[in-house]
């Protein structure tokens, strides 16, 4: 929107931001002459008064100058804080001179306004810029690569930023960096930009376009990002603005191609980095977003080019542009009306002519009038987005789901005496515009849910307005009826009863139903309408008729002559007498005795018959020869490919009658493709019927889209109705895979769902989206729909972490050995996606108990941490470790050095000789957790010590799970190991059983590689009983809840030495526990809670560790029922395992499935206790749905998403075995 206008052919410069009022200085341009061809030059200062509605700017002062200017800037040097008129006007002359003016003296009318002047440059000075950090520094550029840095405090001698660039060239642009004060950039018309570092006095980088067509006419630094700048090209062949980042200077970061011809100037707003002005030879002034390339505003200009454009430093919404037509225009990017500009033009005409006759006729003219259009105003819209300095008090917008969102600013008093707080309440309303569309969609959804497809199709047939629409729905309806091919034939006009009557008339017979029955026996099954008595009567008549016809055969009782003459008959007789059927057939064919040839060929065998048939068809040229050929030779593809498309009904009828099921769809598709390629629009629409017969949904969508107008919602509804019904028909009646969704169908379904969502039908839109597809548009739309419903996407978790992260300051030293720390309690150390974990050397803080005899905490998250008392070597994580589930693929983890272990919490523990332990053994998991962003906190959850821990890989494997906890409140003697989940079993199984259950490395997680030995089998004594899990009553004789809370955490055996002695540990309740030897160091549990390790600890001799424990009385453990809403999970998973067991033949696979069935009990326990997060529950239900549809690939993808985004401690006990089950089901195809 134009605000002001100055009729000057001049360069321009705005007063600094500190100055008020706002001034605009103009200096006569040296690049062109004005309309009067005047050689005078002047320097003028205008005041910007926006309260004045006129377009004229008030001229404050004029100074006659002897110079014309190529560049003019107004610097804030020596400007006082009050904002009085001061600063310095710096002008670049045409003879290499730089002149400094005092603007305050110009406004005051003084004659001596020149502060200083230097003629240092060669050629005109086209580039000037003031350093915004040190306003006394001014950079200038001219010809011969001359760049000077001027100090306004010492203007006598300038400095150079470095050696001149070679070859010498003109400097067209120069600009100081907006963030770093010693960085300067210059550009030349050759297209090369150079960045100078004044501290080093040399160029640090040169930027150039590879096309060598960039003629730099503009240069500007990013206001906020120090390494980014834009270059503008004035070449009409490459009218672009290139955005460069000096960190990646090999190619432009972004290219703006909004101008049609070369660009003459650019200006970047200091108030909003997303506003970049540009003007070009296409007579456009554009305001673009350099980050996206979008044009935010186009100023209404005339047809003249603008050669200079600048933002107003004080008012960020105002800009000025100097054009070649001798005008400097001031605009606002906030919009407005141009009626004032039109009125000014009218006033000029009136003042010039008045009411005088310009043609000398002597008659006065009537007053000049213009058409009054009071209802229409020329409104110029503002920017597409609000600038950074503006915040809207009110607003409205349509959101996803057809919701209108409005907000307004309301002042709400909080309390008496308190200041009012402005709140912005948001109002959301639903907008519905397509009611008919929603009604038809609801009817379709009801038909799908109720399986009432025949009734739905019948209603559509009755409501059809065209014959083609009626045929389409009739064909769709036939898919749900019996004898669909016969019904298709009837729709094509081939009714069995009518055909029988016509044949009977042709044979001059009246038993039409009999003939119809004969025909139906050959081509289709009978409709079964006649009664059994009628069928017997017809059969009797047929036998009688055949008997009468046989009476006409010649009698075999007379004599006949066997001629062997030389004619054709004699030769045929000789061939027959010698058994040469082939020659006899050839003679018959030569004599055109076709019937004799066929009869003899039948006697000669199938091969001769086939040859004779081919010869017969080659000679016969009747109208139906090719049809008979196709029937006999069963070559229907030739008929479909070669028939006249006007007979497409007959070709389709033949395919419906004779085609085999495996070739039926392909033949229908082929016929439909031929019809679709025809130029006749009527035939193209008939191709839809062929695709319906073939059940090809994708081709139907493509054909319908070409034939029908799909611009309205109701036309899209017509298509979707047919698509949904046909997909259901194919799914119910044909053995085809209908789960695949093509790109075109996905596009239409997403459009349809988007329309439903736009009308507020979120649930319906989600129901119509195909489930089994990975099309990006459908996946994204499903995600939006699920979020619009307020529930997470199936199988996905929220990206927001529910855990608190404890920051670690850089350079913070780790704890010193021998000293204990008491940090804040935390249950999980979590790093959001994309954030790096602490580097090696930073220790993840854990919970440390300073005294072994202190009472144990009751909360599961407050578990003690015990660390080795002496420094340990830093282990490396293994390059490859096996997945948690048996048979799973190996997951690669790069090797990373791990932080050293934390200090010892038990300073009085004696030192163990290294002889009894392996020096390379990974000690505590604290350091390893510090280097793993997804692992649990070292102080919170130790790795499990159950049989499942064998699959964690070699030494250095990160802790796997904190989910190996027992169900709370379970007491009494546990059931047998085979009845418990794998996480609750003890390690008392024989090594043979363990090897049969597990795959991958058979060593325990704590076995050193050097001691990779297989222990000898030992005969178990009769009174041997396996070590009791922590659910035994001996662990909690009094049933106190304090001990029960600890029972939910597993223990991890540490290094065990057979030579070390340990002080007796006590429980919290004071009950001593007399068990096996306890390891020295373990995480999460005190030594008295450790389970026995029958394998032997690392470094310890593998000996007899079997303990003779007195048998305990067994008690039955009662479990809570699984909630009804989650019972489907147990049913689905168990049913899938049973199906896999029934199909599996490999004993190893069966053992895997048996183990998976037992280990899934842990999932069911968590469902009983309702300890799983809702996102994991939703993901499990998604997996169950994929199992029901037998789409195991989708189930595995959901599984992967759950494992990668959820808390590992929640899922590690059951998700690996669930992956095993899904993988085996996919492999077995159950």
UniProtKB/Swiss-Prot annotation:
It is found in: Cytoplasm; Cytoplasmic vesicle, COPII-coated vesicle membrane; Endoplasmic reticulum membrane. The modification Phosphothreonine is found at residue 1171. Signal peptide: none annotated. Residues 161-470 are annotated as: Interaction with SEC13. GO terms for cellular component: COPII vesicle coat; COPII-coated ER to Golgi transport vesicle; cytosol; endoplasmic reticulum exit site; endoplasmic reticulum membrane; perinuclear region of cytoplasm; vesicle coat. Its main location: cytoplasm. Residues 789-905, 924-1104 are annotated as: Disordered. Monoubiquitinated by the BCR(KLHL12) E3 ubiquitin ligase complex, leading to regulate the size of COPII coats. SMART domains: WD40. It comes from the Eukaryota. A motif (ALG-2-binding site motif-2 (ABS-2),) lies at residues 841-847. Residues 981-995, 1033-1064 have a biased composition (Polar residues). There is a cross-link at residues 646, 1227 (Glycyl lysine isopeptide (Lys-Gly) (interchain with G-Cter in ubiquitin)). GO terms for biological process: COPII-coated vesicle cargo loading; protein transport; response to calcium ion. Pfam families: TPR_Sec16. The keyword Transport applies. The modification Asymmetric dimethylarginine is found at residue 423. The modification Phosphoserine is found at residues 526, 531, 798, 1173. Residues 799-1123 are annotated as: Interaction with PDCD6. Component of the coat protein complex II (COPII) which promotes the formation of transport vesicles from the endoplasmic reticulum (ER). The coat has two main functions, the physical deformation of the endoplasmic reticulum membrane into vesicles and the selection of cargo molecules. This is Protein transport protein Sec31A. It comes from Mus musculus (Mouse). The gene is Sec31a.
């Amino acid at each position: 929107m134009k605000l002001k206008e100055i009729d000057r052919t001049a360069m321009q410069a705005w007063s600094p931001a500190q100055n008020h009022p706002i001034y605009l200085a103009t200096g006569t341009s040296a690049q062109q002459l004005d309309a009067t061809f005047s050689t005078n030059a002047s320097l003028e200062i205008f005041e910007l008064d926006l309260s004045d509605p006129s377009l004229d700017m008030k001229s404050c002062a004029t100074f006659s100058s002897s110079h014309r200017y190529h560049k003019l800037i107004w610097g804030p040097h020596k400007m006082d804080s009050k904002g009085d008129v001061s600063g310095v006007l710096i002008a670049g002359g045409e003879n290499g001179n730089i002149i400094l003016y005092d603007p305050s003296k110009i406004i005051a009318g003084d004659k001596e306004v020149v502060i200083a002047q230097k003629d240092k440059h060669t050629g005109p000075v086209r580039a000037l810029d003031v350093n915004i950090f040190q306003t006394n520094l001014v950079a200038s550029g001219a010809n011969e690569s001359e760049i000077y840095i001027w100090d306004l405090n010492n203007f006598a001698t300038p400095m150079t930023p470095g050696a001149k660039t070679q070859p010498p060239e003109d400097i067209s642009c120069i600009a100081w960096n907006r963030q770093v004060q010693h960085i300067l950039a210059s550009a030349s018309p050759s297209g090369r930009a150079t960045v100078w570092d004044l501290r080093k006095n040399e160029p640090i980088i040169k930027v150039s376009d590879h096309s060598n067509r960039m003629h730099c006419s503009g240069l500007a630094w990013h206001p906020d990002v120090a390494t980014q700048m834009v270059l503008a090209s004035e070449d009409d062949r490459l009218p672009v603005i290139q955005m460069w980042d000096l960190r990646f200077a090999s190619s432009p970061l972004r290219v703006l191609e909004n101008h049609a011809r070369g660009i003459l100037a650019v200006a970047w707003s200091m108030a909003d980095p997303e506003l970049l002005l540009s003007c070009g030879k296409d007579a456009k002034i554009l305001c673009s977003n350099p980050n996206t390339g979008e044009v935010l505003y186009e100023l209404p200009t005339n047809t003249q080019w603008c050669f200079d454009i600048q933002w107003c430093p004080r008012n960020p919404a105002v800009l000025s542009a100097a054009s070649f037509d001798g005008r400097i225009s001031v605009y606002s990017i906030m919009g407005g009306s141009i009626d004032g500009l039109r009125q000014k033009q009218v006033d000029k005409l009136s003042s010039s002519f008045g009411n005088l006759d310009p043609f000398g006729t002597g008659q006065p003219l009537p007053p000049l009038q213009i058409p009054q259009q009071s209802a229409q105003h020329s409104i110029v819209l503002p920017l597409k987005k609000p600038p950074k300095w503006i915040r809207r008090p009110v607003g409205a917008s349509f959101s996803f789901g057809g919701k209108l969102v409005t907000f307004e600013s309301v002042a709400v008093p909080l309390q008496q005496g308190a200041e009012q707080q402005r709140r912005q309440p948001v109002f959301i309303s639903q907008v519905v515009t397509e009611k008919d569309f929603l009604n038809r969609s609801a009817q379709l959804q009801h038909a799908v849910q109720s399986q009432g497809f025949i009734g739905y199709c019948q209603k559509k047939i009755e409501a059809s307005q065209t014959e083609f629409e009626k045929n389409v729905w009739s064909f769709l309806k036939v898919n749900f009826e019996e004898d669909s091919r016969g019904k298709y034939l009837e729709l094509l006009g081939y009714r069995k009863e009518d055909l029988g009557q016509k044949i009977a008339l042709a044979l001059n017979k009246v038993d039409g139903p009999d003939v119809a029955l004969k025909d139906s026996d050959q081509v289709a099954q009978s409709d079964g309408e006649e009664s059994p008595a009628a069928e017997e009567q017809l059969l009797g008549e047929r036998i009688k008729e055949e008997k009468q016809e046989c009476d006409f055969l010649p009698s075999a009782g007379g004599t006949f002559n066997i001629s062997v003459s030389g004619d054709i008959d004699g030769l045929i007789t000789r061939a027959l007498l010698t058994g040469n059927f082939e020659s006899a057939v050839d003679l018959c064919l030569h004599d055109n005795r076709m019937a004799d040839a066929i009869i003899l060929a039948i006697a000669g065998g199938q091969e001769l018959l086939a040859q004779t048939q081919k010869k017969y068809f080659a000679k016969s040229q009747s109208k139906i020869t090719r049809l008979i050929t196709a029937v006999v030779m069963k070559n229907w593809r030739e008929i479909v490919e070669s028939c006249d498309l006007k007979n497409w009904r007959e070709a389709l009828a033949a395919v419906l009658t004779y085609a085999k099921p495996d070739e039926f769809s392909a033949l229908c598709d082929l016929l439909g493709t031929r019809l679709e390629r025809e130029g006749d629009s009527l035939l193209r629409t008939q191709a839809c019927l062929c695709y319906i017969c073939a059940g090809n949904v994708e081709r139907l969508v493509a054909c319908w889209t070409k034939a029908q107008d799909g611009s309205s919602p109701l036309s899209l509804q017509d298509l979707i109705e047919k698509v949904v019904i046909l997909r259901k028909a194919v799914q119910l009646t044909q053995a085809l895979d209908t789960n695949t969704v093509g790109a075109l169908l996905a596009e239409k379904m997403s459009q349809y769902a988007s329309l439903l969502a736009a009308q507020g039908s979120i649930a319906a839109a989600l129901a119509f989206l195909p489930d089994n597809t990975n099309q990006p548009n459908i996946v994204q739309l499903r995600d939006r729909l699920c979020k619009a419903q307020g529930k997470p996407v199936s199988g996905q978790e929220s990206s927001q972490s529910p855990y608190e992260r404890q920051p670690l300051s850089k350079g913070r030293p780790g704890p010193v050995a021998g000293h204990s720390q008491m940090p804040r309690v935390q249950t999980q150390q979590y790093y959001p996606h994309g954030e790096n974990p602490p580097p090696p050397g930073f220790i993840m803080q854990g919970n440390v108990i300073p005294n072994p005899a202190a009472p144990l905490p009751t909360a599961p998250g407050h578990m003690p941490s015990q660390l080795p008392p002496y420094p340990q070597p830093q282990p490396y994580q293994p390059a490859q470790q096996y997945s948690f589930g048996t048979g799973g693929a190996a997951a690669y983890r790069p090797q990373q050095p791990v932080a050293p272990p934390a200090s010892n919490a038990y300073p009085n523990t004696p030192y163990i000789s290294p002889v009894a332990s392996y020096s390379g053994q990974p000690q505590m998991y604290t350091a390893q957790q510090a280097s793993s962003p997804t692992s649990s906190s070292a102080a919170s959850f130790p790795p499990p010590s159950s049989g499942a821990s064998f699959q964690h890989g070699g030494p250095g494997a990160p802790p796997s799970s904190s989910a190996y906890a027992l169900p709370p409140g379970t007491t009494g003697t546990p059931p047998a190991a085979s009845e418990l989940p794998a996480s609750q079993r003890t390690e008392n199984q024989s090594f043979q059983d363990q090897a049969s259950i597990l795959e991958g490395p058979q060593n325990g997680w704590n076995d050193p590689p050097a001691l990779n030995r297989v222990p000898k089998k030992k005969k178990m004594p009769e009174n041997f009983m396996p070590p009791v899990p922590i659910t035994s009553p001996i662990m909690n004789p009094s049933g106190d809840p304090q001990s029960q809370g600890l029972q939910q955490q597993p223990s991890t055996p540490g290094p065990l030495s057979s030579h070390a002695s340990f002080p007796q540990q006590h429980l919290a309740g004071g009950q001593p526990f007399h068990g096996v030897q306890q390891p020295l160091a373990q995480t999460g549990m005190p030594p008295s809670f450790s389970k026995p390790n029958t394998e032997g600890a690392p470094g310890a001799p593998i000996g007899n560790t079997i303990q003779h424990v007195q048998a305990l009385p067994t008690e039955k453990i009662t479990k809570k029922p699984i909630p009804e809403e989650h019972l489907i999970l147990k049913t689905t998973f168990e049913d899938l395992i049973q199906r896999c067991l029934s199909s599996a033949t490999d004993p190893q696979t069966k053992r895997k499935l048996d183990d998976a069935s037992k280990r899934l009990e842990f999932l069911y326990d968590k469902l009983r206790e309702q300890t799983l997060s809702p996102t994991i529950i939703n993901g499990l239900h998604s997996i169950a749905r994929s199992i029901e549809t037998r789409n195991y690939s989708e189930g595995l993808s959901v599984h992967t998403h759950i494992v990668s985004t959820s808390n590992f401690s929640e899922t590690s006990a059951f998700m690996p075995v669930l992956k095993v089950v899904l993988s085996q089901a996919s492999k077995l195809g159950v």
